[in-house]
Amino acid sequence: MLLNTKQMRLRRAKATRIKIGNSRQFRLSVHKSNNHIYAQILDPSSNRVIVSASTVEAEVKKQYPSGGTIEAAKYVGHLVAKKSIESQIYEVAFDRSGFKYHGRIKALADAARSAGMKF
């Protein structure tokens, strides 16, 4: 059975989420589209969103009208880290949702780390 690109990404994401779910840590989940990038911190017990940031938000959109850039991803990473530290969440497991750790995903992760998050 041949899988297309999206099916392969979802398969990788499922395997990663099983490993993260067993660790019982807060999860920094990242999703990207061609035009935007989204980051959420989820509670390990109830899978509810505690903190979120994305390029759709007015604050980010004002500075970066095109949300599909590496600079916008860095800003979202910094913003989600700042919000999580305000919520007293310092350590998370990074869930890249099956995307390659490259480009915008890497930029978001590096910005979150430099803002004080540990993963």
UniProtKB/Swiss-Prot annotation:
One term of GO molecular function: structural constituent of ribosome
Top-level lineage group: Bacteria
GO CC, alphabetical: cytosolic large ribosomal subunit
Gene3D superfamilies named among the record's database cross-references: 3.30.420.100
Pfam families: Ribosomal_L18p (PF00861)
Signal peptide: none
Cysteine-cysteine disulfides: none
InterPro entries: Ribosomal_uL18_bac-type, Ribosomal_uL18_bac/euk
GO BP term, example: translation
Entry keywords, A to Z: Ribonucleoprotein, Ribosomal protein, RNA-binding, rRNA-binding
Similarity comment: family membership: Belongs to the universal ribosomal protein uL18 family.
Physiological role: This is one of the proteins that bind and probably mediate the attachment of the 5S RNA into the large ribosomal subunit, where it forms part of the central protuberance.
Known partners and oligomeric status: Part of the 50S ribosomal subunit; part of the 5S rRNA/L5/L18/L25 subcomplex. Contacts the 5S and 23S rRNAs.
Name the record gives this protein: Large ribosomal subunit protein uL18
Organism: Nitrosomonas europaea (strain ATCC 19718 / CIP 103999 / KCTC 2705 / NBRC 14298)
